[in-house]
Amino acid sequence: MNSRYVGYICCALAMIGVGSTVVVSKSIAAGLPPFSATALRFAIAFPLFVLVMRWRGVRWPRLDRRDTALVIAQAAAGSVGYTVLLISGMKLASAGDAGVIAGTLPAVSAMVAMLALGERPSPALLGAIVLATAGVLACTVYAGDNAAPHAGGSIVGNLLVFAAIVCEALFILLNRKLRTPVAPLPLSASMCGIGFAVSIVPACFEQAWNMPIDAAALGGVLYYALVPTVAGFVLWYEGAARVSGAEAGLMTALVPVSALALAALLLREPVSAAQLTGVACVLGAVMLATFGQSLGARKMA
């Protein structure tokens, strides 16, 4: 098979795995406290990343104090903050809404960079931010009839999921501030190791061991650690090495689409017109953000 097609397949599978996290987080939220689930996820994923590092002969990075502090902040925001907020939000939000909101990451990242670093976005990125905002509002404000009895909870849940996406955007922003570039594999391993250290203390206060065992929640955490976290990393970087940055960026459009489809198929959630509108807006935002970055890179070159 052509190397580029293999890259497309790898990137697509990785993004479908990311989309599935909002669905599996629904099961996790029903049976485990958020910090306990987060600590368990990293406890499973960290040794696997270490094994992959040894297999590939990759060493741990040597960082100064400033970069070490930034990496810890990355883990606290992008690893622990993201997972805890996503699981907390899934107690209240529908998986379909959460999937649409998760797809706004490229636009939210551009918005955070604009606000925090004073970057001047291109017209394409501004359009992406507007479309992403419209997509979130479509799911949050114009709730369907099925969501009416829980409208207040749904709005709070959607806001928690959006806060999780902001945490992920902060992770991307902090990574750009590192003086010493860290390769993706040791960075992911570090995020899991530090993430476990950060989340284990609040997890102890949740006393999950006093709760009845929920097989679905434990299975969800195992899936989250193995498939989107470890396998998703391997698939994404294997695929991204075979295609252009713009092509890989476009694959992120599969996150909201796969999340909405899996929510309908596995959780039997009804798909509303507001969610379809939100997906359309988010897909447009992903395309604008991807092509906007591609055009900006060409101009700089």
Predicted regions and their residues:
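Helix-helix packing/entry segments at the starts of transmembrane helices
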Residues: C11, T38-L40, S79, T83, ...
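Hydrophobic residues within membrane-embedded alpha-helical segments of Major Facilitator Superfamily
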Residues: C10-L13, G17, V22-V24, A77-G81, ...
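Hydrophobic residues within alpha-helical transmembrane segments
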Residues: I9, L13, A39-I44, A69, ...
